[in-house]
Amino acid sequence: MRFKTKGRTLLDLKIKKAHIPKSFVFTIKQFRNNPKLIIKKIQKKFTKEIIVRSSAVNEDGNKKSFAGFFDSVLNLNSQSFSDVFNAVNKVESSYKKHYSNKNEILIQDMLIDVNISGVITTCDLKNYSPYYVINFTKENDTTVVTSGKKNSENL
């Protein structure tokens, strides 16, 4: 199975009727070549607060997962050029030694009033048994599971 970036996978899921927030994906190379154009597209597509998320080529794979490893920037004014520009740079710099021009940035509407959020894996990370594990929280903070700042629940 060939894994795609987080952004591309979410776009595919949206096509198949999953409820995915409005999304926009672009490569680091596209942003470096014309940041003004990319930010203009973001400002046209999004009118509310956004989240700038990582979508690295090696974030999800058969052998390794970097879920929660890279930065996200939450609660940004989509119409602020400098806020969006700085957030993209922060996420890009979190790629560090995993840097590639093919790495992407994922922009989404910022979710509010979240009832439950979490991460699903296809193996138990403690003993690598091959079954689905869902780590989740019922808190409104969507960063609880990936940040590790509090214990989440497992299913």
Give the residues covered by each predicted segment.
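Nucleotide/phosphate-binding sheet-loop regions of phosphoryl- and nucleotidyl-transfer enzymes
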Residues: M1-L155
